[in-house]
Amino acid sequence: MAKSSNNSKNLIGKNIRKLRQEKGISQDRLSKLADLSLNTIVNIESGGNLNPTIETLTKIANALEVKVDDLIRS
C-alpha cells in the first residue's frame, strides 16, 4: 500500500515537470512564480518531497495556470 502512495506522489512530481516543460518554464522561474524555494520545486519533481502540502500544490498550479487536479491526476 505504501508503494502505491509513493507512486501517486511521484506522479505529482512528474506531472509538474511535464507541465512546466510544456510551458517552457525553468525550475528557477517556477519557484519564483510560485513564491517557493528552488529546492522545493526540485525536490517535488525528483520525488524527494513525497508529501507536498495543498498550499504548495496550489501555488504551483497557479504559477503554471492550471488546476490542482492537473497536478494530481494520473
Labelled PLM ranges:
Residues 1-11:
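A detector for short, charged/polar N-terminal pre-domain segments
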Residues 10, 21-22, 51:
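Short amphipathic helical patch at the helix-1/turn junction of helix-turn-helix
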Residues 14-33, 59:
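Short basic helix-loop element that most often maps to the first helix and adjoining turn
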Residues 16, 30-31, 41-44, 71:
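Conserved hydrophobic/aromatic packing and binding residues within compact polymer-binding modules
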Residues 36-51:
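Recognition helix of helix-turn-helix/homeodomain-like DNA-binding domains
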Residues 55-70:
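DNA major-groove recognition helix of helix-turn-helix/homeodomain DNA-binding modules
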